[in-house]
Curated annotation (Swiss-Prot):
CDD domains: S24_LexA-like. This is LexA repressor. The gene is lexA. Homodimer. It comes from Rhizobium meliloti (strain 1021). Represses a number of genes involved in the response to DNA damage (SOS response), including recA and lexA. In the presence of single-stranded DNA, RecA interacts with LexA causing an autocatalytic cleavage which disrupts the DNA-binding part of LexA, leading to derepression of the SOS regulon and eventually DNA repair.
Length: 238
């Protein structure tokens, strides 16, 4: 199952090649999907390649081959009956590409999207940085809105007064900026990740718990990197 952004990118690439025969650049793909940086496009392409939807062609700049399309796509029947892969060539030395085609919408019937669960994060004492995709969860579309998202399982009780409990799953919108008061995933010294409320104390950054048993921690701005902000929460009752 593809995430919404993975599906949008795959269909954008396919439709663009069908309509104009001109490959979209990474900047055009980034703009079409409303992502903040091209690194997000690289991650989406890698995920599509791992799932067998596209293939990168060696020794050719930005050349991709579309192998198949999602079953829910309107043209899925054509894919199953002799679909001819679209090859995207690099544009080095070629005339500039025209503006990107309109971003394809996900299937109207889709009520939820798959969001990768990247691991466990501390709502308490920071634990090792989270980097592994454990599995995917289904999240209602209206919960997350636009942007790139991932999920984390909560360990600890430092955010209980914000309604975040041990064992909850939080939905995070990927990004490197935050406003004071946002609940964020903060990476400390490139080693430890924690979920806290973001504050500024002069030139420093304060990571504030929502539990009086935990002290607010103050760091220099060069020691903290914002990895995303909280946009939703899922709780299972046993």
């Amino acid at each position: 199952m593809l995430t919404r952004k993975q599906q949008e990118l795959l269909l954008f690439i396919h439709e663009r090649m069908k309509e104009s025969g001109v490959p979209p650049s990474f900047d055009e793909m980034k703009d079409a999907l409303d992502l903040a940086s091209k690194s997000g496009i690289h991650r989406l392409i890698t995920a599509l390649e791992e799932r067998g939807f596209i293939r990168r062609l060696p020794n050719r700049a930005r050349a991709l081959e579309v192998i198949k399309l999602p079953e829910a796509y309107a043209g899925a029947s054509q894919v199953r009956r002799g679909f001819s892969p679209s090859v995207i060539e690099g544009s080095l030395g070629k005339p500039a590409a025209p503006p990107p085609a309109p971003k394809p919408a996900p299937p109207a019937e889709a009520a939820s999207v798959a969001v990768p669960v990247m691991g466990r994060i501390a709502a308490g004492v920071p634990i090792s940085a989270i980097q592994n995709n454990m599995h995917d969860i289904s999240v209602p579309v209206e919960m997350i809105g636009s942007g790139e998202h991932y999920a984390l399982e909560i360990k600890g009780d430092s955010m209980i007064e914000a309604g975040i409990l041990d064992g909850d799953t939080v939905i995070i919108r990927n990004g490197s900026t935050a406003s004071p008061g946002d609940i964020v995933v903060a990476l400390i010294d490139d080693e430890e990740a924690t979920l806290k409320r973001f504050r500024r104390k002069g030139a420093s950054i304060a990571l504030e718990a929502a539990n009086p048993a935990y002290e607010t921690r103050i760091f220099g701005p060069d020691r903290v990197k914002i990895q995303g902000r909280l946009v939703g929460l899922i709780r299972r009752y046993h």
